[in-house]
A protein has these predicted regions:
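Glycine-rich nucleophile elbow surrounding the catalytic serine of serine-hydrolase chemistry
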Residues: 14-24
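Catalytic active-site module of serine/aspartate enzymes centered on a nucleophile-bearing elbow/loop
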Residues: 155-189
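Conserved alpha/beta-hydrolase catalytic His-Asp/Glu region
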Residues: 47-49, 66-121
Length: 189
């Protein structure tokens, strides 16, 4: 950002390792972080999510990408959306298709996710922060997102009780966008 001449940015980490990376940016560059938004995140992986990530990698290695894609897609989307969109979600251009034929990349992603640990450093985040908790998220469940909110001074939390890991459906996406845009507007200026 320095090379681009950008002084402050909104760090919007939506689902997964991107949200974790933005925790690191907010910690190491408080001058750069105007705000931070985290969804589908964690401060430190617990045993269950570690086993889940390792299982996905093992399935990818042993059974192939298609089996991995089916497994993670069923866990990532709510049942109605999955049933209505299965043909789009699974296949060559479906969910997580960037990992097709990329077991090495999947391995690095898993290692990065498992080594992420900001729990004792979140207290140093100064940027206004919004952490969203999705009640039906079976991947990064609220047991993982709550410690992020609780350990960042002044962080705001927002619960989407009926949202899965990936927020889908018109009403849920509108709700998500309204919460996100209202938070960013409140802290712009």
């Amino acid at each position: 950002m320095d090379l681009l001449g950008i002084d402050e940015v909104h760090l919007v980490g939506i689902i997964g390792i991107g949200a974790c990376i933005f925790q690191e940016v907010a910690i190491s560059r408080p001058d750069l972080a105007k705000t931070m938004v985290n969804t589908g995140t964690w401060a430190c992986p617990d045993r269950k999510v570690a086993d889940q990530l390792n299982l996905w990698l093992e399935v990818h290695k042993v059974m192939g990408f298609e089996a991995f894609q089916k497994m993670v897609t069923m866990e990532g989307f709510n049942p109605e959306f999955y049933a209505q969109n299965k043909e789009k979600l699974i296949g060559p251009n479906g969910a997580w298709s960037d990992l097709r034929d990329n077991v090495a990349t999947h391995q690095r992603l898993t290692e990065a996710a498992l080594s992420h640990n900001t729990l004792d450093r979140l207290v140093s985040i100064q940027a206004p922060t919004l952490v969203m908790h999705n009640g039906l998220d079976f991947i990064t469940a609220p047991r993982l997102t709550m410690p992020v909110e609780q350990n960042i001074p002044g962080a705001e939390g927002y619960w989407m009780r009926n949202a899965a890991h990936v927020v889908t459906g018109r009403e849920a996406r509108i709700e998500f966008c309204n919460v996100l845009l209202n938070f960013l507007e409140k802290h712009s200026g």
